[in-house]
Each structure stands twice: as structure tokens, then as C-alpha cells.
């Protein structure tokens, strides 16, 4: 017999809260938080696109003078444009974690609150909310606003980001963009906020699983490489043996032998003396 427990949770939706002006539920991101995640995602995008050794033909380097020699993709204007145009779409991968404070409320992965609610539903518990179940995984008002502000900030500070990109890039992008330009003379406290995670945090658990999976894959690749190396060595050894055997057969067919015992049989050492 299935027992259904009714869990009534009065969580106002972001849309309803914004209409009523209820600041208790909706905390839109401030300038510091926007710059923090813009710089984080931009650094991540540059890291991902900086591993290639691809060379670009000068015909596609339309921002530079014509006739210049081919350039590396990692130094190209194309890479810069691709990163700046797509960086804000990466913000949509974030979710709102209401159980966290400050800028830490924005993070990838499902929030602890909604992970708990999904688990209850999967166990047959009836969860009653004023947000329909179909909208549980919809983008929150806060994340949507984060993306909107990201678009404006990237466009406004494109020249600053380009100066960093075309420079030595020795200085951290968050420091260069946020502390020295976007938030110059303003509060930069959110830039130092970090989330260590806590026991049972589903987002932290998911991140740990990804890291472990990556390590296992690395180890497996190493083992596969060792196995392949052993197989190659065995094949080489077999080929050497087969080569020596085939050469021996060819010599025997021609009437020659390299076997010491056969030589002793064919040419005995103790032959009878002959007189001249």
C-alpha cells in the first residue's frame, strides 16, 4: 500500500514575487556579481579554446591588414570574437541556489532545495507548491537578469577585454576587468566569495563525480596504452622468431646448415689416415 505524504511548500515564484515587489524572494545580481561570473566564464572559454594548434589563413583574419602571414588561432581576432559573443550564453547553465548567500547563490548544477523536492517526488511523496512541477527547471528571474546584464557589460567593456587579450595576459582577468575597470572605486567583496560546499550538497556532489570520472578516464587511457605497448612488443618478438625460422629453412633447402651437431655428423673429426 502506497502512502502519499502531502508536503505543502509555500515558495513564491520569481515572476509572482517580482510583480508584488517582494524583495524577500527575488535578489537580482548586482554589478560585482555580474562581473565576477562574466570573468569566470570568459577565462574558462579562453582556456578551452587555447589548447588548439590550428593556424588560420590570412583571408579569414579580416580585422588585420591583408597579405599578412598565417597566424595561430590562439592569437587571432576570430578567437576573441567567438569567446565574447558566446560567453553570456554560458551564464544560462547556472541555477539559483537560494540556500546559499551572496554571489554563491549562482552556481551550476541543481540547487539543494530542488534536488530534495525531486527526490521526494521520485519516492512518491506529493509535493504541493504554487510553482507548477513543469516550471521547476525553468530559468529563474535572477539568472535571466544575470545573462541580460552580462550582454550589456561585455559590449560596454569590449575594448578593455580586448586590451587584456592582446596584451601579455599575465594579470588575472577578474582583477584586470572587475577590480581595475568595472568596479573601480566600488565594492569588490563578492569577488573574494567562494563556496567550499557542504555535506549533502547535490551540486558539490555532482562536481566531485565529474572530477573522479575524469581521473578514472585518465587512468584507463594509461592502462590501455600499456596494454597496446605490450602487444606490440609480443608481435615484434614473434616476427623475429618467424624470420629466424624461415631463414633456417631456406639454408637447409640449399644444403647448408647452421646446426653444430649436423656439421659434426657430416664431417667427422676422426678420419682414417691416408698415405701418400
Curated annotation (Swiss-Prot):
Physiological role: Toll-like receptor (TLR)-specific co-chaperone for HSP90B1. Required for proper TLR folding and hence controls TLR exit from the endoplasmic reticulum. Consequently, required for immune responses.
Span of the signal peptide: 1-16
Gene name of the encoded protein: cnpy3
One Pfam family recorded for the sequence: DUF3456
The keyword Mitochondrion is annotated on this UniProt entry: no
Biased amino acid composition, Basic residues: 210-219, 228-239
InterPro entries (alphabetical): DUF3456
GO biological process, one term: innate immune response
Keyword set, alphabetical order: Chaperone, Coiled coil, Disulfide bond, Endoplasmic reticulum, Immunity, Innate immunity, Signal
Disulfide bonds, paired cysteine numbers: 32-190, 35-178, 88-150
Protein location: Endoplasmic reticulum
Residue ranges occupied by any Saposin B-type domain in the UniProt entry: 30-269
Identification of the protein by name: Protein canopy homolog 3
Annotated Basic and acidic residues bias: 240-252
Metal-binding keyword on record: no
Coiled-coil positions: 137-162
MF term (GO), any: signaling receptor binding
Main location: endoplasmic reticulum
Family that this chain belongs to: Belongs to the canopy family.
Region (Disordered): 206-276
Gene Ontology CC, one term: endoplasmic reticulum
